[in-house]
Amino acid sequence: MNYTLTRILSNSKENRKSLQEDDSATLLIEQHVNSNIYLGKLKHILKSIVKWGRGNSLWPYNFGLSCCYVEMTTSFTAVHDVARFGSEVIRASPRQADFMVIAGTPFIKMAPVIKRLYDQMLEPKWVISMGSCANSGGMYDIYSVVQGVDKFLPVDVYIPGCPPRPEAYIQALLLLKEAIGKEQRPLSWIVGDQGIYRANMESERKRKHNERAKMTYLRSPEEI
């Protein structure tokens, strides 16, 4: 391969540019300013700090219904160490908890108690449905079991399984943390032109019902 060397004339008029005309110098100045001076709105950075704090310090409410609660408490042992995600502080009072895990079978007699405990939690608050019984009633398709806790509570994360493993519970925490980081409003109450009102958030089960109803092929347990 042949190379051609050309000498640069430093005194030519084409190479003489002022600092304002030099694009590389302008780009360097802009990068220096953007890296040292925050030019955005203060409320944006404050919201990001608040969401970071909420996502990394999720305190669960100590509440269990049946066997899924055993798997939930297993995640607090040294083997799984859920303290890595700031969620090891189990609270005995709903007023001190950030989210509630419905771990087990929600019976109809227990539904008013669960709803009352949820109402006692302070905003912002979240709900994790853990296990098949909490998600859809599981194998208890009977009169005494609520067919899904989202019948009376807004659920943020669903954990499939009967019962789910502790790793599934940890993954649900990470999904909840990711969802908190994407929230556009700090609380579930919205201050609008017509006053203060609460957002009517549709449950994921209801939103995805039509899509899931179109499924005609279901895998057998041997294929899973």
Swiss-Prot record:
Cofactor needs: [4Fe-4S] cluster
A GO CC term attached to the entry: plasma membrane
Keyword 4Fe-4S: yes
Protein name: NADH-quinone oxidoreductase subunit B
Subcellular location, principal: membrane
Bilayer topology annotation: Peripheral membrane protein
GO BP, one annotated term: electron transport coupled proton transport
UniProt lineage: Bacteria, Pseudomonadati, Pseudomonadota, Gammaproteobacteria, Candidatus Palibaumannia
Keyword Membrane among record annotations: yes
Reaction catalysed by this enzyme: a quinone + NADH + 5 H(+)(in) = a quinol + NAD(+) + 4 H(+)(out)
Chain sites annotated for binding [4Fe-4S] cluster: C67, C68, C133, C162
Keywords attached to this entry: 4Fe-4S, Cell membrane, Iron, Iron-sulfur, Membrane, Metal-binding, NAD, Quinone, Translocase, Transport, Ubiquinone
InterPro entries from the UniProt entry: NADH_UbQ_OxRdtase-like_20kDa (IPR006137), NADH_UQ_OxRdtase_20Kd_su (IPR006138)
Documented EC number(s): 7.1.1.-
Cofactor note: Binds 1 [4Fe-4S] cluster.
